[in-house]
């Protein structure tokens, strides 16, 4: 969400970043017909949502999470997929092509929106050419591919997308390098609250000492 927001901001769009990222949707006061909302919608919010509909919706992955809330994986997936099931004709649903649970759910549900499956294993020239080390990890590369595909549908200027990619710093506490010496790099990834969100940075590093904490979900 943060990356897409910054891409749109660099395109001089009237854009608001809201939702689970920390800014309540209802706190936004000045909006017009051209205002674009980039919303991070959690399964908690979607669970009781009946009418929320987004023209462009994305599910990057699905893995067991928030089971203490939803009780079963099936109910968790049902809440997440409301994001796509509430869409109508002319809307766009962006999903990870090589995700087993997403593929299974797509077969079980007929969606009204146009489904765009993103192959996260495919190389992208913009990523290959960037000197921004933030996008070297698997997770951040996937985030970029989703933001890039949405940007293409929105017909955003490629040059400005490239500008944003080169200078993007990411989120605080998300794969944030807080110390680096010759043989030691300390990474703060405390914003990752599940194994599926941590696996990208683990795959991108070697000789790891992984410190975990928090409440089991």
Model-derived regions: residue spans:
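A conditional alpha-helix N-cap/helix-loop micro-motif detector
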Residues: 18, 73-77, 191, 217
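Nucleotide phosphate-binding/pyrophosphate-handling subdomain across enzymes
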Residues: 14, 133-217
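Flexible active-site lid/hinge loop adjacent to a nucleotide/diphosphate
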Residues: 21, 25, 31-135
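A conserved segment at the C-terminal end of the G1
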Residues: 1-16
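Short glycine/serine/threonine-rich phosphate/pyrophosphate-binding segments
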Residues: 1-3, 24, 41, 194-198, ...
């Amino acid at each position: 969400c943060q990356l897409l927001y910054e891409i749109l901001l660099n395109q001089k769009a009237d854009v608001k970043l809201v939702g689970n990222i920390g800014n309540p949707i209802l706190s936004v006061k000045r909006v017009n017909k051209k205002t674009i909302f980039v919303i991070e919608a959690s399964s908690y919010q979607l669970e009781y949502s009946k009418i929320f509909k987004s023209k462009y919706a994305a599910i990057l992955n699905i893995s067991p999470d928030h089971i203490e809330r939803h009780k079963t994986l099936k109910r968790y997936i049902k809440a997440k997929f409301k994001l796509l099931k509430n869409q109508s004709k002319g809307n766009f649903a962006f999903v990870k092509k090589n995700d087993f649970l997403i593929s299974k759910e797509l077969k079980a549900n007929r969606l009204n929106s146009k489904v765009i499956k993103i192959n996260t294993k495919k190389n992208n020239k913009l990523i290959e050419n960037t000197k921004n080390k933030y996008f070297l990890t698997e997770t951040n590369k996937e985030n970029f591919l989703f933001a890039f595909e949405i940007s293409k549908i929105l017909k955003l200027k490629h040059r400005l997308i490239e500008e944003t990619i080169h200078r993007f710093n990411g989120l605080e506490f998300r794969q944030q390098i807080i110390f680096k010496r010759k043989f030691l790099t300390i990474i703060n990834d405390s914003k990752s609250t599940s194994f599926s969100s941590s696996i990208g940075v683990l795959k991108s590093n070697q000789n790891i000492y992984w410190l975990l904490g928090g409440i089991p979900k």
